[in-house]
Amino acid sequence: LGVIVVRTKRETNYEEKLSKRVKTSGCAQGTSFGDIMENFEGVKLPETKIKTSWLYSLGQKINATPSLYLAAGAIHGSVLCKGNHPLAYMEDVGRHNAVDKIAGHMFKRQILPDDKILYTTGRLTSEMVLKTVQMGIPILVSRSGFTAWGVQLARQANLTLIGRTKGKRFLALSGTQRVDYDIDPQTIPGERTEIQRKASR
């Protein structure tokens, strides 16, 4: 059994943190410890808008990006975007790990979050929403669906939450007033089948 001891300059009451347990809505009903929800209460993300043309463009660009998913499947991806431009693409077997890699990328390069979009392949659960809010990113997009608590927390934090993005379709359940319908979806070409993995997505 390996043991790692970490000492910090700041004192922390671990017993108090462990007593504050929050059941999450993700895989196997996880548990978050500490004052994460207390810190969440005062968060209000900026009123950053997103254009529907960006959604369509990002979907096409991300789907065409060479990746482990296209090669083998069974991989989650997270993409940091600005407007309709993907800035960083991270993959991992775990959807949370892929998001954490984006967080680390932003921290190391001191990237400001206010005008960014986080695009993920994972479900929009409470944990995904909490992580995105902690990162300060005002827009979270996924090709997957939602959980009820994830939507509730997104609305509380002023996070724009968009799921079920595929081709010309998407569903916005939080921050709908910040979605700018700037393009007719009928003018968007369909997804190219030659970039799909085994003819399916």
Which residues fall in each region the model found?
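Generic structural motif recognizing short loop/turn segments at the entrances and edges of beta-strands
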Residues: 1-4, 85, 116, 167-169
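Short, Lys/Arg-enriched charge-dense amphipathic segments
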Residues: 11-23, 90-97, 134-144, 187-192
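Conserved active-site and cofactor/substrate-binding residues in soluble primary-metabolism enzymes
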Residues: 22, 31, 50-53, 57, ...
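Feature captures the catalytic cores and cofactor-binding loops of soluble hydro-lyases/lyases
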Residues: 95-173, 178-185
